[in-house]
Amino acid sequence: MSLLEPPPETHNKSKAMAFTLVALLVVLVVVLWFMFRYYPEKKVTAQFFDALVAGETDRAYGVWKPTPSYRKDDFLADWGPSGYYGPVKSYKILRAKAPDKSDSVAVTVAISRFAPMPTEADANSAKTKTVTLWISPSDKSMSFPP
């Protein structure tokens, strides 16, 4: 190399490209984690409400995994065709979150006596109820919040 020759070029493009790809991968992992972190709890909630919509209260009671104090009669008084929340003809899972200092996941669901789920402009939307269920991540049992 002579005095008048320029120094050899260093290729920093590959380092910048690698850094960019790693950063994008990290962002993708974080976004996917936030999207799917409560997926199992949402899935068991959907199974429960799918059974209620189909009118299969026995299957819904099994998905609920009740404690001995929550008898089938109590379940039907809440979720049966003439129960407080029934008949459930359509539903929409609104959100799922883990409350502070809790080992359960709170899943909030809008339920309606009408199918399909009424829009906000529909007059039947006033009869839509919102219920929060607690799902235990360990065994996917359901309960009402304390």
Language model regions located:
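Generic structural signal for short, solvent-exposed loop/turn connectors between secondary structure elements
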Residues: 39-42, 66-70, 137-140, 145-146
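Short, intrinsically disordered/low-complexity patches at protein termini
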Residues: 7, 81-86, 93-97
